[in-house]
């Protein structure tokens, strides 16, 4: 799915760079996490969250690095639901802020 997202978003990445970016996050890296969206046997997407520190917010913050939903299930509110539930899912991590950047050219309305 990461390859599909990068292709769609015009991100020039290789298998090696994708593996180097994903593998630590799948193995309990303190720098971030990857969560599958949907059932583990047949996920319909994923979200990558990375962690940092914010002087402005006075503590740890998170950044939505990637959010991907398979084309066949888009337009059903899946991404909206994930983003709405994200603060609840990360509440125990002590986050002070969650940041999201949007590439408007990728929005399919």
Language model: regions and residue ranges:
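Active-site acidic-Proline motif in GNAT/NAT acetyltransferases
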Residues: 70-72, 76, 104-105
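Generic enzyme active-site microenvironment
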Residues: 63-64, 99
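Residues forming the Rossmann-fold NAD(P)(H) cofactor-binding site
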Residues: 80
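Acetyl-CoA-dependent GNAT
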Residues: 1-59, 65, 70, 83-85, ...
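Conserved small/polar residues in nucleotide/adenosyl-binding loops
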Residues: 107-109
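Conserved GNAT acetyl-CoA-binding A-motif
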Residues: 91-102
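Peripheral/terminal regions associated with large enzymatic or DNA-binding modules
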Residues: 74, 88-93
